[in-house]
Amino acid sequence: LKQSYHEFYRIYGTDTYEDKVSPETIITEDSNSGYQFFEHVCIENGLKCESMNGKSNVFHYLNKHKGEKILVIADGAAFGSEIDRVLQVIHGRKNVALYLPESFEWMIMDADILKNNTVRSILSNPSEYVESKLYFSWERFFTAILIEQTKDTYLAYAKRKLNPAYLSGAIKESILRKMNIIDLNKKDE
């Protein structure tokens, strides 16, 4: 039995989603680069975006906002301890979807923006590359890889403040395209 660490980005909710997921609100569990990216996308598209400033706040937000069409974006690498509570609070609700990539850094690398064979190899089998003594979590591992692979380039990555290059047309679209059935485009009014 082989564990797979890069497939936990499927969309979770009451049902399996086959049609487009079109949220009105996006909530992210963090307030760093991932939130900054989605906040920018939401502003462009007239959607609401909020940071939960921590994974444990997702449950409380969903409990208070039962009528909104919400997409939760959280690092699958770190969200495991909250998944049971969150699935219980969204049980029976068709207006909430969970998108749980390994991390925002993983999303960037998975979008193949870097066109880097080392990154491709790491993503295809991360357990062959990670040293658990060095990295407390998969998120930290993927962050370290992205920082290392982009240093001294126009895509230089920093966790706390998103490089504006990631908000530009083709790069932004490459990241969003990996989200398959999630539609974050402007809503017709």
Protein language model features and the residues they cover:
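Activity-critical C-terminal alpha-helical subdomain
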Residues: 73-153
